[in-house]
């Protein structure tokens, strides 16, 4: 075959290839313009979801008894309805509205139940879709609105610093337990942050090899966590967190209520916390004796270590009641993790206080 024939064949093949490529491109462009991507709409039948939820837990002859309600909602029904009522009154998001077609939207019960289920079980956002009939993005929005407004409505009451009356009650409890002047136990816990941004992992990763966020808390015997400092990187130890913590701000700025108590005939005017051995030897921290010598020292070490476990018990209850704290944090936003943690603390003490009030009335 001559060179001229070969050149003609190559040119012809190139023309055919160019034509095929141009036709393929035009077909793709035309199909894209003719078939725009639309948002997938799923008819979830919201009314059926509300009716099922109402019949299961809230009607007069509900399917599930009160003990199962408390186990699944982590609180009794009266308290849950109180929260739903407050949110419905003060937050427009939790009020039931109608969509553009006039159909009723999600009820306050559905929205609050979705948020509580995520907090209680630490499950994925779409895990409640089949039962409550709301989508993943709506469930996450319910969770964030719930945590944000629980803190706004109840935080000042249940996450506040102790008033003079509260402080006197804590001092009385401490004296009964053999520690006059004690107002609580202080310690830290680490919450794994699964979706920590890659650029931050070095700052938040400690010896376990996983990034964590630190919660510093002061807890009393009745599990009241009246001081919570959350958000420090996991590489910090308890002393580093204490350096950043506002736990002593009221004392330094002269806003703390005055305290007076007597031990062995000596009067003191500064309350203290029970701690483990890592904390500095300040007058506001009382630690155990690592190597007690003699019966008195052994008795003191035994009582101090037992009483100090109040804060560890509070951490255990926190993780047992709300698995979202026990499981790794899935959000990319540390602020939202902070709101989830703070809301959980508020909800736990709110439920505990209501239960204690109910026991007193009985």
Predicted regions and their residues:
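Short, polybasic Lys/Arg-rich linear motifs in disordered N-terminal/cytosolic regions
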Residues: 1-362
